[in-house]
Amino acid sequence: MTFAAPLEAKSIRFRARSFVAFTLTPEAPMVEWLQGLDHWIGNSPGYFAGRPVLLDLNVLKPAPSEIAALVAELGTRGIRIYAIELEGASLGPDLPPLLVGAKEATTEGLLPGRKGGQEGSGKPDGKAAEGRAPDHGTEGRADAGAAGKGKAGASKTDESGPQVSHYDSGTLMIKTPIRSGQAIMHAHGDVIVLGSVASGSEIVAAGSIHVYGTLRGRASAGALGNTAARIFCRRNEAELLSVDGWYITAEEMEGVSRGKPVQAFLDGDGLRVETLS
């Protein structure tokens, strides 16, 4: 006598998520671009550690062999490429997959792209390639991400994260200090920190960033293309300040705005850091 167990219908669950992606867009000449990248990494060690990065090659349009060499170069710098954007390309199995159908997002919704400017300290100066931070965009895919679609959220690097409050306006309020190693990524509006931000931590916000204590970590406002975003802090000891991807480092602020209450904002085609009275 045989016994047949009843079949159980099992469903496969698919969910769409939106998340903040970090995008690198290489430009020729590659030697100079890599030197600029090394300068960025030197000023912000560990910035790419553990983060998937999108490689946008629509400007460079390299051959597959050149892509492999570039991915290897980035790998030696601790940058892990999880997907490549290159219209009309066909890549082999030894390269990261092509990202198809994703759109860049801003606080106003999905857009095909956005514009950028140049950075500076006080006055706009320097080449764009030397002052451009990695782009931050939201890419829609059917897998896990840092911020879920719908309710405003923040991602942290450990379980014992800061106390946060969410508001319908999209503002994220953090009531406790942000410790070293923690990362707050808020793709729905402003971030307000009532305490201090430790060295080695990071805040990424679609809107403005307000720190009512000492800012010692990295702060990136306007991460989804909001050029009107600003960064405010009571005491500036930041490792890096960035608005809409244009940044200024600690060494560039030394002797000018370090240790003072400041605001950082885009002024024309440059990033300006001003002291507050």
Swiss-Prot record:
Domain of life: Bacteria
Positions of region (Disordered): 107-168
UniProt cross-references to Pfam families, sorted A to Z: MinC_C (PF03775)
Protein role: Cell division inhibitor that blocks the formation of polar Z ring septums. Rapidly oscillates between the poles of the cell to destabilize FtsZ filaments that have formed before they mature into polar Z rings. Prevents FtsZ polymerization.
InterPro entries reported for this sequence: CAP/MinC_C, MinC, MinC_C_sf, Septum_form_inhib_MinC_C
Listed Basic and acidic residues bias regions: 122-142
Organism: Mesorhizobium japonicum (strain LMG 29417 / CECT 9101 / MAFF 303099) (Mesorhizobium loti (strain MAFF 303099))
Protein's UniProt name: Probable septum site-determining protein MinC
Keyword line: Cell cycle, Cell division, Septation
